[in-house]
């Protein structure tokens, strides 16, 4: 029945219902004299409930338990917490327990902190446990050690004898009685955590077997009952916030989870497993051997599920396993079947296992990407730095499947645990294990560390106890068309001295079904047989791909129809000819093709080696067969004459060394039998170079145009002082805006500039109408290329002096005004180049500064009345004329880019002189109940009478090719409009707005300023 006052003591009402006579509830604390235990079936919280310093002891049962078989506690958005409490010591009790189903739902927060449970059932127990709809779930600094462990003396850690394995099965079942375990959750059927909104956190908890979860299998059949075994499950799904398991410690195995099926599904936040540890305090490792397949003690730094599966699927956030440790096997995970689909980034880093599998230990592993990337980095173990594929149970075959479907999978810096250690991405303990390595589209599966599969017939260092007479097949891209790459590129000089750091081995038959298998940068791959008639084999400098004798039923032959060359790896003086070999026959089929493979076509053809002729001794066919070991046919280069930027020329391929064409060392390469040579012939004797237009970098000289316009914006902000008749000291503060749209012109780039900032001005206005003032300001903004992915973020600092005076010319008042301005601007350019090969952007960055100046002298005079056609018009509309002389220009500093396709821009400059002329109109407005305002309108024509277009020299750093670059060729004729409005808001205060439009062919500039001033 639902929880009520009639069925429960007043003390528990204070805790579970926050008794408050209908007023707002507040957290309640239970004192040590509270009567326990409490029993119920349906419990509702009307307020926050806190259990603090509760002691259940050895005589009491669960603190909260079910009257019958099932218990439901509904939080109604309140908090339930246990702090500094001790649970019951009795075996079948916990803090909260139910005989069948336990449901905890709709809490604002469910929190257990600094509690101790010595009972077998831990803290929360039931055959089925469900936590759903909570705001957050927190288990922090709890201890769930089970006291019977103390019967094992510390001085003589004699482990219990392992249970004998069934004759028909060689499963990975543990050898320790299930009674000797302790976990926060103890379930027989399932634990499900779902729909948590803010976060799930298990931090710094301690236990024996599985600190957080221990699955207690109910095997009635095994005990004489008529039932069947029930596999417990641990599920975390549909959680919105972060899910984290950090610094949990298990003394015997499974740092977080021990036994049962584990599933993380459809969670939106990140999932983090960090710093979890599984020790082996019972000494199970010493009591068992790998041959028995019973060794789980100290296994699984995070999850130890030796008889079941672990799956991650549909999770939208990142997944991180780092700094987890296992005394046994599986630094993060030990399981029977492991499956992971990466919808976001997944990282296994710095995990360690003293035995096998620094990150993962399992006989069946299936890992794939679905929009995210997967990185295995700096994991360590005795066998398999990142992954150890263990032997499958009797009668079954292990499998390793890695699929980079939509996102890369990378193994880098994983090591064996001996010192100094060997690089090791994966160790496959059985030769019968099948291997499927796949990549789709532009995704890549990259092994910077080797993969080794046992080959007992070849004398492997650790032969498989159950070696199959027929090694498992190795398939490349059975379900993809991307790149599977083995490379030794990341090895340090000392690591390169140890050949095992770069050697991968598969004893079975290797088939390239699609896409490409890449072996490059000194990597070695040996297999039983090699067949590449559908997919491509791409080889790089120093690579070796060979079919070697060793396993039964292998004919150790190599047959290829599609070849590729990792071109960039051969363009260094330290290149080495690749080897394609076999202990049997090596065949390059008739009609074979060769692809020029390169990550960046632009970078390759920037290489100065292509100025002249070049020979590349690409690959040597090698066979140990006494006769007819090598069969070679002519090879056709695909897209040999494809258009490209950079140095121009053509390619050819032949099994005969060409004459008078040096290699990348500058030497004539040796004439070696069965070697395929590639030859480059330049289009001209002087190395014709074709520049990619997007690499011109016209934003650099155009920055002088932009800086000049910014100074003009600064000048327009002073318009209030030029038209004012006030007398006194005037201080003003302005907001400035600058918008310039420069259109593209044929193959010339345009730009779009947006800048905004402020201007502060101080000026003295004298009684004779003269003024003198100074101004300071800054503008911040960005200039974007109109044609390419390039932008320049700049900030400009400006300082100016200005003045005005009145002069009498032939009895007519003439206004003379002037200004000199200096600007210092800092520019940071970021350029992106879209790479057609990778379908990604390459990036480069640089920064430089400009020094700019602007000066003008102008006069406002009624010369329109001197001209008969304009006299009457000027009088009717009270128009006057003006004329100015303007000079603007600047210098840009040199700069060198960093990143991809780098360039060097030399110092540049640009200058412009113009003679604006036009008319001025004034209008005064007096609107009732509104302050008076004065409108000034300038219209005119601005011809540029002398110009040096901004320019500089751009140099390609890779080859020193220099190209003069000019800014946009602006039209020399422009029309402009200036509108200024002053609002007299106070006797000593003014508000004003100024707008200017400068329009010329293929460029439009808008300048806006507004502000306030104060007259003193």
From Swiss-Prot:
Q: Which GO terms describe its cellular component?
A: cell outer membrane; extracellular region
In terms of superkingdom, the source organism counts as Bacteria
- Tell me which positions the record assigns to the signal sequence: 1-24
> In which broad location class does this protein mainly occur, judging by the first location in its UniProt entry?
secreted
Q: Where is the protein localized? A: Secreted, Cell wall; Cell outer membrane
Per its UniProt record, what Pfam families does this chain match?
A: Chlam_PMP, ChlamPMP_M
Q: Which InterPro entries match?
A: Autotransporte_beta (IPR005546), Autotransporte_beta_dom_sf (IPR036709), Polymorphic_membr_middle (IPR011427), POMP_repeat (IPR003368)
Q: Does Protein transport count among this protein's keywords? A: no
What keyword terms does UniProt attach to this protein?
Cell outer membrane, Cell wall, Membrane, Secreted, Signal, Transmembrane, Transmembrane beta strand
**Chain ranges of the Autotransporter domain:** 697-1016
Record membrane topology: Peripheral membrane protein
| Family (UniProt) | Belongs to the PMP outer membrane protein family.
NCBIfam families documented for this protein:
POMP_repeat
Protein name (Swiss-Prot/TrEMBL): Probable outer membrane protein PmpH
Q: What species was this sequence derived from?
A: Chlamydia trachomatis serovar D (strain ATCC VR-885 / DSM 19411 / UW-3/Cx)
Upper taxonomic lineage: Bacteria, Pseudomonadati, Chlamydiota, Chlamydiia, Chlamydiales
